[in-house]
Curated annotation (Swiss-Prot):
Biased composition (Polar residues): 99-109
Location(s) in or outside the cell: Nucleus
Keyword tags: DNA damage, DNA repair, Metal-binding, Nucleus, Transcription, Transcription regulation, Zinc, Zinc-finger
Chain positions of all zinc fingers (C4-type): 327-346
InterPro entries linked: TFIIH_Tfb4/GTF2H3, vWFA_dom_sf
Stated family: Belongs to the TFB4 family.
One function term, GO molecular function aspect: zinc ion binding
Protein name: General transcription and DNA repair factor IIH subunit TFB4
UniProt function note: Component of the general transcription and DNA repair factor IIH (TFIIH) core complex, which is involved in general and transcription-coupled nucleotide excision repair (NER) of damaged DNA and, when complexed to TFIIK, in RNA transcription by RNA polymerase II. In NER, TFIIH acts by opening DNA around the lesion to allow the excision of the damaged oligonucleotide and its replacement by a new DNA fragment. In transcription, TFIIH has an essential role in transcription initiation.
Subunit annotation: Component of the 7-subunit TFIIH core complex composed of XPB/SSL2, XPD/RAD3, SSL1, TFB1, TFB2, TFB4 and TFB5, which is active in NER. The core complex associates with the 3-subunit CTD-kinase module TFIIK composed of CCL1, KIN28 and TFB3 to form the 10-subunit holoenzyme (holo-TFIIH) active in transcription.
Pfam families linked to this entry: Tfb4
GO BP terms, alphabetized: nucleotide-excision repair; regulation of DNA-templated transcription; transcription initiation at RNA polymerase II promoter
Biased composition (Basic and acidic residues): 89-98
Length: 387
């Protein structure tokens, strides 16, 4: 008994070493004007943008190596708000720090974020707010040229492309301590030219002692679009790509109705889907339900909706289908029978007899009400009308 008791109270160390892997958070904001106009009494897109910036800042504060990206899905197309490939943020921050008190009043008033904010927070917030204002001005000037269909699938493609680039090019990201070791080693190697051999050995030693960690990634979609104008095939293609890359797709759905296609994307990638009926407390929802890192999602019951609507889309009309026809060759889904008698996807020719039966409709026997004859006896006539 003593041996058993000793084994019970013996501390057994875990085999897995604790890790604090950096994470990439990509936010995709759908800025379709019609959808935001419908919920203007509940929340505005400016308030949503502020809540998302607080969410991004909180993500950056968890780990010094965390990365963020912000993409807007506009009627004119999808655009990167942060990072902007046309702008060098290091030069912008160095110019601001170098000028100091020499900034004139015009420059200080043009700043969208306070000067006392943390540098990384300020860079992200200013870039996102500046590009959002440009997008709003562009939308107001080009209302007639706006597209009727949603560009959310293109924004998802941009997010996955940027994620793939970060995971491949920066597949091993050094922690803060490792970066400090490399910086110190490089400074020592450049200090004197006579000690080249010594500096090279120190550089090699610093590289070997760095702790390299892998990056994880996730995507958050914020949309208030209630129209069924999202293309099914591009959304499913991006969903399967995210599933292969093991990138969860979280969805914060505003508005009145759920989005069946976004539900499928979130469910297939082990993401979180929430239909937020009261968006006034959006920041609380973002900081709780959508703050779960991908590394711990297998240990937590996700606060998502398990009742997923798996409706498909018609390949001819593009609308969602409850009951339709399926091609036996390529599994193409159709809500109507094509006039050419061929599959719109693979071009296979359908049998004319089967098409004639399908066009004729389904025959269902209908039982009429009983009629009374002259003697008072009931009789029923069974007919089979065509519907």
């Amino acid at each position: 008994m003593d041996a058993i008791a000793d084994s019970v109270f013996t501390d057994i160390g875990s085999s897995d070493s604790p890790s604090d892997d950096p994470s990439l958070l990509t936010v995709v904001l759908d800025v379709t004007p019609q959808s935001w106009y419908k919920i203007r009494n509940q929340i505005t897109i400016q308030e949503v943008a502020k809540s998302l910036l607080v969410f991004l800042n909180a993500h950056l504060s968890l780990n010094n190596s965390n990365q963020v990206a912000f993409i807007a899905s506009t009627p004119q197309g999808s655009k990167f708000l942060y990072p902007n490939p046309e702008k060098n943020y290091d030069e912008v921050s160095s110019k601001k720090n170098g000028e100091g008190s020499n900034l004139n009043k015009a420059d200080s008033t043009s700043s969208l974020v306070g000067d006392g904010m943390y540098r990384q927070f300020r860079i992200v917030d200013e870039a996102v707010l500046e590009k959002l204002n440009e997008i709003f001005a562009d939308i107001s000037q080009n209302v007639d040229k706006s597209r009727s269909n949603s560009t959310l699938s293109g924004a998802l493609s941009l997010a996955l492309t940027y994620t793939n680039r970060m995971l491949n090019l920066d597949s091993s990201i050094s922690t803060t301590t490792a970066s400090a070791i490399n910086t110190t080693t490089n400074a020592n190697s450049n200090k004197t030219s006579s000690s080249g051999t010594t500096s090279n050995s120190m550089s090699t030693g610093g590289t070997n002692t760095t702790s390299l960690t892998s990056m994880r990634s996730r995507i958050l979609i914020v949309s208030s679009n209630d129209d069924n104008d999202i293309k099914y095939i591009p959304i499913m293609n991006t969903t399967f790509a995210a599933q292969k890359m093991k990138v969860p797709i979280d969805v914060a759905k505003l508005g009145e109705r759920d989005s069946s296609y976004l539900q499928q994307a979130s469910d297939a990638t082990n993401g979180v889907y929430l239909h937020i009926a009261n968006p006034e407390g959006l920041i609380q929802t973002l900081s709780t339900a959508f703050f779960i890192e991908p590394s711990i999602r297998s240990l937590i019951i996700l606060p998502t909706n398990s009742n997923v609507n798996y409706r498909a889309s018609c390949f001819i009309t593009g609308k969602s289908v409850n009951l339709g026809f399926v091609c036996s060759v390529c599994l193409c889904i159709m809500s109507i029978i094509p006039k050419e008698g061929k599959c719109p996807t693979c071009g296979s020719k359908f049998d004319e007899k089967i098409l004639a039966q399908l066009r004729r409709g389904v025959v269902i026997p209908v039982k009429k009400k009983r009629k009374l004859d002259s003697n008072g006896n009931g009789q029923s006539d069974n007919v089979t009308p065509e519907i």
